[in-house]
């Protein structure tokens, strides 16, 4: 028989009163509807120096693979470094060296990214309904469908947008302009009234070829066929384990190459993330999907296996899928009467008691209940010889995870199962993804102004603007050169990447930021052919097992105008 709330150690008065009124564990809850708008991306790959500026604390921390990213986070890379940010199973952003991006809006299916400097490539791998904005200091770009879109922003805040595959619509307060596959738009000036010209696409280089290799890894994803819709990070599972059939669950995934005594939720650390609270950051190379979706179980033949859930229901992301409890003595002042905190992975169909969201925000013990139980009787995986993990509660909150260890069933025969918000306050160290010191803190870019299609003030071009520099044109000026018709196909062997007039590429030796350049104009002017170009040929790859490989880029409708005035409801800058 359960003994409800018989603490052997003194609780803070407020916690004790709350606990006495909540002796029965809360019924399992699904995340509140507003939780689903709190999108989470991840660092899926990194090489070199990668730093993250936490939007909740403002601190720069060292990036790690599988680090969760949220709205207002920034990602910066050092010299000769690169990173990949994965938003879902279809949308990824790759960041080159000496670059910085800001996740201005990150909700489920809504990704607005500001590119402060450097070169990035946004890749839509397969069909996606996501609302995507790629904002630069001058313009806002919105991809139309699957494709490959390269964007560079120079130190002088000039922008270069290249459609390698697919089409992208570019927005300004004065109107919009299409960039078709095989074209590059060069834009400069303030977000209120930028200038641009369209030229042949920049030639492919090592950055593009590296991106093509990453595309193949995403497209040749055998694991995608075994997981429900909405699960990201499955491409990492192919190299990290195998899929096996285990009744009654069906196909499940088991990791290979793990150390003896390995268990889920042991190789990594707990990090405090805004809104979601304590979030598991795995040090396993494949450790995104199996720790934020589905359940784990232990099979006598195969060992630990991950059950991704039913294929017919779209999966929702969770910061972790475990049961928390306190155990052992010495917990005075910790906040819940125990000296240690433990956790166990939830088994298939076991209920999840969320500790995050609006219901549990705003106070140390708000929405919390603790029940004295035998943990091995409460959780199936607690009966596995190495299923329980624990550590000192003080080390947990201080971000010291070297002491994480296996916990025996005998140690938790009398423990306090926690339901609701965890009574463990984060420290500054709790917001860091690793013990590594950050080595790349970029110059301040928080004051850089970006144009956003969705968040800027309606308005036409301000009166009294100064005339364009010699050789430049502004959007809407009579007689501006027209450049935005879909370019004609070129035959193999034609020269590609040639700039029109005397224009040089951004950053080319000898180019002058102030020198007059021909061909610049303003949004809203009529379009005509921009000359020859070489079409982009996406890398060939076999379809994934789920049949969700990338489709060929679609052409824009013939009736779609190359440019049009700004739609009503466009708002000003931010």
Show the residue positions of the predicted features.
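Hydrophobic alpha-helical segments, especially transmembrane helices
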Residues: 7-9, 28, 543
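Flexible, surface-exposed loop/linker segments and immediately adjacent secondary-structure boundaries
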Residues: 28-169, 173-176, 180-184, 211-214, ...
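Bacterial N-terminal signal peptides that target proteins for export
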Residues: 2-13
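Bacterial N-terminal signal peptides
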Residues: 12-21
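Low-complexity, repeat-rich tail regions
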Residues: 186-574
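Juxtamembrane cytosolic interface motif at the C-terminal end of transmembrane helices
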Residues: 23-25
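Short, intrinsically disordered, low-complexity terminal/loop segments
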Residues: 2, 28-30, 571-574
């Amino acid at each position: 028989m359960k003994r409800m709330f018989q603490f052997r150690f003194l609780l803070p008065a407020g916690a004790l009163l709350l606990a006495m009124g909540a002796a029965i564990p809360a019924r399992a809850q699904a995340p509140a509807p507003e939780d689903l708008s709190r999108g989470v991306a991840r660092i899926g790959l990194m090489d070199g120096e990668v730093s993250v500026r936490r939007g909740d604390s403002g601190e720069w921390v060292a990036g790690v693979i599988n680090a969760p990213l949220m709205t207002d986070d920034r990602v910066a890379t050092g010299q000769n470094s690169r990173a990949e940010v994965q938003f879902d199973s279809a949308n990824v952003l790759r960041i080159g060296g000496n670059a910085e991006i800001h996740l201005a809006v990150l909700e489920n299916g809504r990704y607005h990214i500001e590119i402060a400097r450097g070169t990035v490539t946004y890749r839509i791998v397969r069909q996606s309904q996501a609302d995507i904005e790629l904002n630069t200091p001058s313009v806002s770009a919105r991809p139309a469908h699957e494709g490959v879109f390269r964007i560079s922003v120079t130190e002088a805040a000039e922008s270069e947008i290249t459609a390698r595959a697919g089409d992208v619509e570019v927005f300004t307060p004065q109107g919009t302009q299409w960039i078709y596959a095989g074209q590059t738009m060069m834009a400069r000036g303030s977000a209120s009234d930028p200038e641009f010209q369209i030229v042949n696409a920049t030639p492919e280089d090592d950055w593009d070829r590296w991106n093509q290799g990453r595309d193949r890894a995403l497209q040749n994803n055998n694991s995608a066929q075994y997981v429900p819709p909405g699960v990201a990070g499955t491409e990492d599972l192919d190299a990290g384990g195998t899929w096996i059939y285990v009744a009654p669950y069906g196909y499940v995934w088991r990791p290979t190459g793990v150390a003896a005594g390995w268990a889920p939720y042991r190789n990594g650390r707990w990090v405090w993330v805004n809104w979601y609270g304590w979030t598991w950051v795995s040090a396993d190379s494949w450790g995104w999907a199996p720790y934020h979706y589905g359940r784990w179980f232990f099979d006598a033949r195969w060992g630990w296996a991950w059950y991704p859930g039913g294929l017919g229901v779209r999966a929702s992301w969770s910061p972790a899928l475990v049961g928390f409890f306190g155990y052992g003595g010495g917990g005075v002042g910790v906040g819940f009467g125990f000296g240690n905190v433990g956790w166990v992975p939830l088994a298939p169909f076991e209920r999840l008691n969320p500790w995050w969201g609006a219901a549990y925000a705003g106070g140390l013990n708000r929405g919390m209940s603790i029940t004295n139980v035998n943990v091995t009787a409460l959780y199936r995986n607690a009966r596995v010889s190495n299923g329980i993990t624990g550590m000192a509660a003080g080390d947990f909150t201080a971000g010291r995870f070297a002491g994480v260890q296996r916990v025996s069933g005998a140690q938790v025969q009398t423990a306090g199962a926690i339901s609701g918000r965890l009574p463990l306050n984060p420290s500054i160290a709790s917001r860091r993804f690793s013990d590594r010191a950050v080595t790349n803190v970029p110059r301040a870019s928080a004051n850089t102004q970006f144009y956003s299609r969705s968040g800027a003030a309606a308005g036409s071009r301000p009166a009294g603007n100064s005339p364009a520099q010699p050789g430049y044109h502004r959007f809407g000026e009579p007689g501006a050169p027209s450049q935005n018709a879909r370019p004609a196909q070129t035959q193999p062997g034609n020269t590609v990447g040639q700039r029109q007039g005397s224009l040089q590429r951004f950053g080319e030796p000898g180019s002058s930021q102030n020198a007059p350049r021909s061909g610049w104009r303003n949004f809203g002017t009529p379009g005509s052919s921009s000359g020859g170009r070489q079409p982009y040929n996406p890398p060939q790859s076999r379809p994934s097992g789920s049949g969700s490989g990338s489709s060929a880029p679609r052409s824009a409708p013939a009736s779609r105008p190359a440019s049009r005035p700004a739609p009503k409801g466009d708002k000003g800058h931010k």
